[in-house]
Amino acid sequence: MSIKITYNDLEIRTALDGLLSKMNDLTPALRDMGEELMLSTKQRFAKSESPDGDAWAPNSPVTLARKKGTSPLIGESRRLRNEISYSVKNGELLIGSPMVYAAVQHFGASRGQFGKNKRNSPIPWGNIPARPFLGLSDTDKENVLDIIQEHLGL
C-alpha cells in the first residue's frame, strides 16, 4: 500500500521556483559575503587580533626601533590591510591580499626559512610569529548565515 499526496498551491510553487532560481546563481550572495568579510578582515588590523579573537604577537624591540607605531602588521604604508580584497568567480569567493609577504605575516616564518640573500644573510633575518588575519570569526559566521538567509528570502 502506498499513499501519494499532491499539493498544487501556486504560491508555494512560485516560492520554490524563486528559491531554485536564487540557488542557481550564487554570485549576488557571494559578493555580499565578500564585502562583509573584507571589511571584517580589515578591522582585525585595527584590533591587532586573529579571527579567533587572539591578540597578535607584539613586534620585537628591533622591529619597533625600525618603524613608526607599535601595532603589528601596521606598517607606514598600511598596504597589507588596504589591499585586502575579494573576488567571486565560478561560484567561489576568494579573500586575500596580493602582497607577497601576506602569507608570512599570516602563517609566520622562522629565521632563514627562505634561504639567504646575496650578502649571505638569512631570509627572513629573524623569526616572524604568525599573526593570522584571514578567516572567519564567530560573528563573521553569523553574518554569512544572515546573508544566505536574506538571499534565500528566509
Which stretches of residues belong to each language-model region?
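Short, Lys/Arg-rich flexible segments
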Residues: 1-154
